[in-house]
């Protein structure tokens, strides 16, 4: 059962129409999880409440995904592919570049 905490920085640019549901559906597909087993908790953080040492680059609004999952793939390659699929799914749903999606697993 995957559980994801998704934090959007500077979130007003992302349409909120059923965003948590769209993320849950996309993550379920990306992870190959059975229907009804992927949970998402969505957080929005104002860009003023986010910082990087030395200052965040202009226009960079990251998305952080903290992912708990039982039964990760056994090989490093398969796990990497799974994490890439998660980042790509979140980027697509949120309309952010995949390079700005950070998956913590």
Predicted region positions:
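A domain-level signal for the structural core that forms small-molecule/cofactor-binding pockets
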Residues: 1-105
């Amino acid at each position: 059962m995957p559980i994801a905490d998704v934090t959007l920085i500077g979130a007003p640019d992302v349409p909120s129409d059923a965003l948590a549901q769209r993320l849950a559906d996309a993550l379920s597909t990306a992870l190959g999880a059975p229907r009804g087993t992927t949970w998402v908790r969505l957080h929005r953080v104002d860009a003023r409440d986010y910082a990087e040492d030395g200052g965040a680059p202009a226009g960079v609004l990251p998305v952080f995904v903290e992912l708990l999952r039982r039964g990760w793939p056994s090989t490093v390659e398969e796990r990497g592919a799974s994490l890439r699929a998660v980042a790509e799914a979140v980027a697509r749903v949120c309309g952010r570049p995949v390079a700005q999606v950070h998956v913590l697993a």
